[in-house]
């Protein structure tokens, strides 16, 4: 059976993810929540633009309308 997108996101709970935004920039942080609209809650999130951290947040909700992609981040 094919893997569903929300299954991938669910397996990423409590792990670091990269959230790419439609208008450029990205958030990187620990995924602590999400819903079917791809609204995501990140803890310890950094907003990154052009490879540089612009601002750090303790906890932030990113509205699903702004999300282009969500990717698990493997930290070794």
From Swiss-Prot:
Coiled coil: none annotated. One of its GO terms (cellular component) is ribonucleoprotein complex. Transmembrane segments: none annotated. One of its GO terms (molecular function) is RNA binding. InterPro entries: LSM_dom_sf, Sm, Sm_dom_euk/arc, snRNP_Sm-like_arc. SUPFAM superfamilies: Sm-like ribonucleoproteins (SSF50182). Residues 4-76 form the Sm domain. It holds the Pfam family LSM. The keyword Ribonucleoprotein applies. Keywords: Ribonucleoprotein. Belongs to the snRNP Sm proteins family. This is Putative snRNP Sm-like protein. It comes from Thermococcus gammatolerans (strain DSM 15229 / JCM 11827 / EJ3). The lineage of its organism: Archaea, Methanobacteriati, Methanobacteriota, Thermococci, Thermococcales.
